[in-house]
């Protein structure tokens, strides 16, 4: 396992270590980070064993499954969400372990009273809180993590939003989390897990740090508990080195721990594309992305960003077996096969070797247990939001959270502009639409305009809910009137300033200067000036050669690489590059 020392997007914290004992060894961990990160960075990936003695490691990585439970200073804790701060000893839970019952203290039990209780401080929960607060409705948010933000904290990429006034569009996930949380964190109960819903609309909580039990009495309940990873079945699916995307992404982007440097990704959807891309940013090599369907999933612009890096996407392929290393503490290969309807075709098996991690990105399952029980306790006064109701993008979760806030207000009889509710509802529906292809090829200016001055090409061929590019152009040259249209450049207004290139969340805007044979490409990883490169199209096919002349640094950390092209027939085909020496 590897500690991430440098990152093109994340601001890494100053090193400040604490120490604890693990099986007779002294382990150093970064202050504020989890026990799981410290153990993995020290090379200890096995946290428990099955009843037959097989090694076990992290499974969900977000505190939902209990697979990583260990004894922390004598208490059972989930090490994926337990900080190293103040910890003295960590050890595996013995097979015959039976915790000692401890009488509850005689102190006063806290009972919070509010109008709306929100379970889950992720995108949906925080958006609901923000809107409820704006409407003047008292609320309390409960989350079992040490920081609010949920899945947004794990996301380093820019997000798609279609907005009348720019707020979240083009923002990175972790920045959206901070914005939604706001300056005041009053009414947010962190490190608290909901362990039951009781009669009389009472919610039972337990603080996972102090073990304090408390209650919330609320009139309305919003369940925004997110989702859990779906894990397909294959041989050796339980060995360390096989991790769900949630584990891989959280450890990488929040705990700054890279679980492997030679990655096989399973699942060609948005999660598969983005975790692979983010792993590359953190220093990993992606061997391939395999997909059981006969076509790619997710947004085409997300698939393009990994293809331009030379990462192969293999459709109609399934994972048959993970090949463990000698001591079953990791993987060294995988057996894949061609498939039809997800069934492997005999005789097509092949081995992908020289890997040290399998990144499982095969979807999510709503974590809706509290929503189901909430219906019997709160009746019609329970609401679901985000992935707890429908698996979708963070954009959808935010909009559904806001929609729920308006629905609560209606039930309470509060007056507000109904058009606001309709607008949020429309945006929520639009955010779930599948991208619809509208163009066969990107729009480009005529030959006279192309040779007169620099210009941009927007390689956005599908209509979907995103428009940060329209706010980026200082000349107002980019328009996108609806979620079902594509952005269009008015080349009479465009002056070729390239300010839009780094503001596309899908990295799908490229700049060209035919007079100088120069291309301007968005980059979000370390780039060395003077390097010779192969120029590639959106499929990763080589279409020319060039040299990186200059890297223009940008505040949003999507920089511009100015590349001098050579040996290229059509400059407009260039969408990326691959280093000649890798």
Q: How would you label these PLM feature ranges?
A:
Residues 542-553:
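Short beta-strand-centered aromatic/proline hotspots
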Residues 461, 517-523:
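Short alpha-helix capping/helix-loop boundary micro-motifs
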Residues 455-459, 464, 468-507:
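Acidic (E/D-rich), amphipathic helical modules within compact regulatory domains
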Residues 382, 526-528:
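Short, well-ordered loop/turn sites that connect or cap secondary structure elements
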């Amino acid at each position: 396992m590897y500690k991430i020392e440098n990152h093109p997007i994340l601001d890494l914290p100053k090193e400040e270590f604490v120490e604890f004992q693990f099986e007779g060894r002294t382990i150093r961990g970064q202050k504020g980070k989890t026990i799981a990160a410290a153990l993995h960075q020290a090379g200890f990936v096995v946290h428990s064993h099955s009843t037959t003695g097989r090694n076990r490691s992290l499974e969900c990585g977000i505190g939902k499954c209990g697979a990583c439970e260990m004894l922390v200073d004598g208490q059972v804790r989930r090490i994926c969400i337990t900080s190293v701060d103040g910890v003295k000893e960590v050890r595996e839970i013995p097979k015959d372990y039976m915790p000692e019952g401890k009488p509850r203290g005689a102190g006063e039990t806290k009972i919070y009273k509010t109008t709306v209780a929100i379970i889950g401080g992720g995108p949906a929960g925080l958006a609901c809180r923000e809107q409820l607060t704006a409407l003047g409705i008292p609320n309390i948010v409960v989350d079992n993590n040490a920081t609010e933000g949920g899945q947004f904290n794990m996301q380093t990429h820019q997000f798609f939003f279609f907005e009348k006034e720019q707020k979240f569009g083009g923002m990175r996930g972790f920045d959206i989390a901070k914005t939604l949380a706001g300056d005041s964190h009053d009414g947010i109960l962190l490190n608290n897990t909901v362990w039951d819903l009781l009669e009389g609309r009472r919610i039972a909580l337990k603080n996972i740090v102090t073990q304090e039990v408390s209650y919330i009495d609320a009139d309305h309940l919003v369940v925004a508990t997110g989702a859990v990873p779906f894990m397909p079945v294959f041989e050796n699916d339980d060995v360390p080195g096989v991790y769900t995307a949630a584990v891989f992404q959280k450890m990488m982007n929040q705990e700054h721990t890279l679980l492997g440097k030679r990655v096989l990704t399973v699942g060609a959807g948005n999660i598969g594309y983005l975790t692979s891309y983010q792993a590359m940013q953190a220093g990993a090599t992606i061997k391939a992305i395999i997909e059981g369907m006969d076509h790619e999933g997710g947004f085409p612009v997300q698939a393009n960003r990994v293809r331009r890096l030379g990462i192969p996407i293999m459709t109609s392929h399934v994972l048959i077996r993970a090949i463990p290393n000698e001591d079953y503490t990791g993987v060294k290969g995988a057996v894949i096969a061609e498939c039809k309807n997800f069934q492997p075709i005999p005789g097509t098996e092949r081995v992908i070797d020289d890997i040290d991690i399998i990144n499982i990105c095969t979807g999510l399952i709503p974590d809706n247990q509290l929503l189901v029980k909430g219906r019997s306790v709160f009746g019609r006064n329970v609401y679901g939001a985000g992935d707890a109701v429908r698996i979708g993008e963070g954009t959808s979760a935010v909009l559904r959270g806001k929609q729920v806030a308006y629905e609560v207000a209606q039930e309470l009889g509060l007056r507000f502009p109904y058009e606001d509710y309709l607008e949020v509802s429309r945006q929520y529906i639009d955010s779930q639409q599948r991208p619809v292809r509208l163009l066969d090829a990107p729009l480009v200016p005529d030959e006279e305009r192309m040779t007169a001055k620099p210009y941009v090409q927007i390689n956005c061929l599908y209509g979907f809910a995103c428009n940060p590019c329209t706010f980026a152009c200082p000349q107002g040259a980019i328009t996108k009137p609806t979620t079902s249209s594509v952005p269009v450049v008015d080349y009479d207004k465009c002056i070729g300033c390239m300010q839009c290139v780094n503001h596309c969340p899908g990295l799908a805007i490229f700049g060209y200067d035919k007079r100088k044979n120069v291309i301007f490409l968005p980059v979000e990883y370390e780039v060395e000036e003077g390097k010779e490169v192969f120029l590639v199209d959106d499929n990763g096919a080589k279409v020319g050669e060039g040299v990186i002349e200059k890297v223009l640094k940008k505040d949003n950390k999507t920089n511009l690489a100015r590349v001098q092209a050579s040996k290229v027939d059509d400059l407009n085909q260039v969408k990326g590059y691959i280093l000649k020496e890798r």
